[in-house]
Amino acid sequence: MKLLNYALVYRRFLLVVFTILVFLPLPLIIRTKEAQCAYILFVIAIFWITEALPLSITALLPGLMFPMFGIMRSSQVASAYFKDFHLLLIGVICLATSIEKWNLHKRIALRMVMMVGVNPAWLTLGFMSSTAFLSMWLSNTSTAAMVMPIVEAVAQQIISAEAEAEATQMTYFNESAAHGLDIDETVIGQETNEKKEKTKPAPGSSHDKGKVSRKMETEKNAVTGAKYRSRKDHMMCKLMCLSVAYSSTIGGLTTITGTSTNLIFSEHFNTRYPDCRCLNFGSWFLFSFPVALILLLLSWIWLQWLYLGFDFKMFKCGKTKTLKEKACAKVIKQEYEKLGPMRYQEIVTLVIFIVMALLWFSRDPGFVTGWSVLFSEYPGYVTDSTVALVAGILFFLIPAKKVTKMTSAGEIIAFDYTPLITWKEFQSFMPWDIAILVGGGFALADGCQVSGLSNWIGSKLSPLGSLPVWLIILISSLIVTSLTEVASNPATITILFPILSPLAEAIQVNPLQILLPSTLCTSFAFLLPVANPPNAIVFSYGHLKVIDMVKAGLGVNILGVAVVMLGMFTWIEPMFNLHEYPSWASNFVNQTMP
């Protein structure tokens, strides 16, 4: 028993040693570069999945192991750790820092909820819409962390409003009973006594049933706990929590910068296929926005049905509000009024945000000529990261308040220059662990390419070409969706990209046809609290059990894969000419052939 306790305490250390030793015969027996790289890939993949070491520390292992096995020089590996992705990430984090510092995100969320209304069904959709919109530009984690306190306050206010409404109704009922119609006993005389005898409640009558129902209600309150008056209140809290968790993830699908998974895929893809210039901010938004919108609406309906039942009365849009809805609207309005009028800092941040989004969309939209033609002498030199860096630098240049202080007479008495954000504030928001993790993924992909492991995997997967393309896409999507529940999303896409790309090349299918659905499905971590940070944040509020998230998440996972499959064979296929094997993929295969 003592030995088992020691094993549990040192389980991470034992797992690291065990993994290294178990796969060690592979490079010792099969002395090829492919086998040596496969050994490194297996070790890193297991460390990422189990998190035996921190993800960012595991991401540094290629810098240690590739030179030791003679696959890549140390200087070559080091150059893979900083790419165009990191410049884009820096610019986006500058924007996110300013948005959160000046509370612009809270103003946007509350305003969107106020626009939608406070009817329970529409309120949930309002929270989901605002959360998804914010998640397009901020990290999923920070979005969920910001919206959840508002949702919690609204939920508690709804519960207290219902209690107040019931208390009011009960008071009114008691007063009505006490001041009922006066009956002239002299007129009805003996009939009154006869009626009393006739109306004496019998066992099982409605009077007894009322007592039983009140007793059951009391027991129900005891079961559901002091926080909830009834099971319905508990279900409503679960619904709101899950709606925030899932919508923060769904919103991140919409833009390249919405989640680290999209950024990692974009950089990997552009590095592997530099001749393909079809993926940019605008094209990504055009194909992914319908996917996210459909999935958001279906998830809303699914969660409504699962926790509150599906009743068309819930979707009414009448002007008459119940006491509960009025209380809910009051809370949201009070939260919004606390922010005060829109400040100078919020306006500047909003303007930079809008300009940056417009520049991203218009750089090279595809259906019209973008502003990138201004740099036609250097095609491909200007990317989305260029826009992000320009915007990011502006946050360090534009002052957050008036530069000078004056007396009432108009004399300048002091100069005070503070930018919208400072370097320390930026550092506190910058996800350095993700930056290192992505760099490790790039280094791992380069090692697989240099060693020939990617080509070897592709040759072994070529028999899958006999299967229908839709079945290959479905299988890969289901595998990714399952794996991302137990491994982090960035680790999942980093591990699978070097496998799925050679698969597409081997069976002569447009790589985007397999990689796009797999990338979207990598974000479908809806089942477990540990699957992604937004799930963990909403789980920490204590309204949910693991089984609640599993039941709801399973339905959203199925809906997600179905919507992605629908999109791949409808609007996405003509956008990227997925039915043709592109020349840029052929060029890559020819370049890597010995």
From Swiss-Prot:
What reaction does this enzyme carry out catalytically?
sulfate(out) + 3 Na(+)(out) = sulfate(in) + 3 Na(+)(in); selenate(out) + 3 Na(+)(out) = selenate(in) + 3 Na(+)(in); thiosulfate(out) + 3 Na(+)(out) = thiosulfate(in) + 3 Na(+)(in)
For this protein, the record's PROSITE patterns field holds:
NA_SULFATE
Instruction: Specify where it is mainly localized.
Output: membrane
Which sites carry carbohydrate? 174, 590
Query: Topology versus the membrane, per the UniProt entry?
Result: Multi-pass membrane protein
Q: Which domain of life is it from?
A: Eukaryota
One GO biological process term is:
sulfate transmembrane transport
**Where do the record's region annotations for Disordered lie?**
192-226
Could you list this entry's UniProt keywords, alphabetically sorted: Cell membrane, Glycoprotein, Ion transport, Membrane, Sodium, Sodium transport, Sulfate transport, Symport, Transmembrane, Transmembrane helix, Transport
- Which segments cross the bilayer? 13-33, 40-60, 77-97, 113-133, 134-154, 239-259, 283-303, 347-367, 380-400, 461-481, 487-507, 511-531, 552-572
Q: Name one Pfam family in it.
A: Na_sulph_symp
Chain intervals with Basic and acidic residues compositional bias: 192-220
Localization: Apical cell membrane
**Recorded GO MF terms:** monoatomic anion:sodium symporter activity; secondary active sulfate transmembrane transporter activity; sodium:sulfate symporter activity
Q: Which InterPro entries match?
A: Na/sul_symport_CS, SLC13A/DASS
Any one annotated GO CC term = apical plasma membrane
This molecule's function is given as: Sodium:sulfate symporter that mediates sulfate reabsorption in the kidney and small intestine. Can also mediate the transport of selenate and thiosulfate.
- Tell me which family the UniProt entry assigns to this protein: Belongs to the SLC13A/DASS transporter (TC 2.A.47) family. NADC subfamily.
- What name has this protein been given in UniProt? Solute carrier family 13 member 1
> Which organism encodes this protein?
Mus musculus (Mouse)
